[in-house]
């Protein structure tokens, strides 16, 4: 049986932490900032955990 391949799109978008949680970046933080409030762009900083409903699906894409 061939080796299972990691979904390349998912590997670029999600990271697994040391404890096994899956984190992602928030959307709407790439461009067109001139009409977005500074408070919104600060809120969209950093990483956040993948919701519990999506964790199993993302895990399968990452060969978890």
UniProtKB/Swiss-Prot annotation:
Biased composition, class Basic and acidic residues, residue ranges: 34-48
GO annotation, cellular component aspect: cytosolic large ribosomal subunit
Molecular function per GO: structural constituent of ribosome
GO biological process, one term: translation
Protein keywords: Ribonucleoprotein, Ribosomal protein
UniProt feature, compositional bias: Polar residues: 50-64
Pfam families assigned to the protein according to its UniProt record, in alphabetical order: Ribosomal_L35p (PF01632)
InterPro entries xrefs: Ribosomal_bL35, Ribosomal_bL35-like, Ribosomal_bL35_CS, Ribosomal_bL35_sf
Disulfide cysteine pairs (residue numbers): none
Family: Belongs to the bacterial ribosomal protein bL35 family.
Entries under PANTHER family matching the protein: 54S RIBOSOMAL PROTEIN BL35M, LARGE RIBOSOMAL SUBUNIT PROTEIN BL35M
NCBIfam families, per the entry: rpmI_bact (TIGR00001)
HAMAP family for this protein: Ribosomal_bL35
Protein name: Large ribosomal subunit protein bL35
Protein source organism: Mycobacterium leprae (strain TN)
Taxonomic classification: Bacteria, Bacillati, Actinomycetota, Actinomycetes, Mycobacteriales
Gene this protein is translated from: rpmI
